UniProtKB/Swiss-Prot annotation:
The keyword Chaperone does not apply. Glycans are attached at N88. This is Transmembrane protein B169L. It comes from the Viruses. It is a multi-pass membrane protein.
């Protein structure tokens, strides 16, 4: 499995164990809801003495069971939403940190690369031309004008001069 995914699951487990409202070590929210419901029922029976009459006892038992089921669903719903929020936040943290580690190389800051200018691209795309044959001996005067097209030698692309075997095949 992916190491980032496993690290994210471990991080999520730590956040579930330290759930703020309940501070519980149970991972299953249904068990937590059951414990909270049991505590509520104990308090309910401690405050309200159960009736002695058998008919009233049955009605009270039905109401108590309805209350138990309602409280279970309520606690499960609340806990489930809290755990989903925790999962979504930690999952997003894992995604952001894995993207940061993958493309930025950890804490290392990489400066942005500026795109090359248009003039540089045009110069690089066209091969440089140099005259074929040996260079004339002696220094060239600075104010001399180029020879006419009839006197000049044909220009050969620079790549052919440097690596002729690559282009002749």
């Amino acid at each position: 499995m992916n190491v980032d995914f496993i690290a994210g699951i471990n991080n999520l487990g730590e956040k579930i164990y330290t759930c703020e409202p309940f501070k519980t070590s149970f991972q299953n929210p249904f068990i937590v809801a059951l414990i909270i419901t049991a505590v509520v029922l104990v308090v309910f029976f401690a405050i309200c003495n159960p009736p002695v009459d058998k008919k009233r006892k049955t009605k009270t038992a039905i109401y108590v069971y309805i209350c138990i089921v309602a409280l279970l669903f309520l606690h499960y719903y609340v806990l489930n939403h809290q755990l989903n929020d925790i999962y979504n936040k930690s999952n997003m943290d894992v995604i952001v940190s894995s993207i940061h580690d993958k493309y930025k190389g950890g804490d290392e800051i990489i400066p942005p690369i500026s795109p090359p200018s248009v003039s540089n691209e045009l110069e690089e795309d066209q091969p440089k031309k140099i005259p074929a044959g040996p260079k004339p001996a002696g220094p060239k005067p600075a104010d001399s004008k180029p020879a006419s097209s009839a006197d000049s030698k044909p220009l050969v692309p620079l790549q052919e001069v440097i690596m002729p075997s690559q282009y002749n095949n």
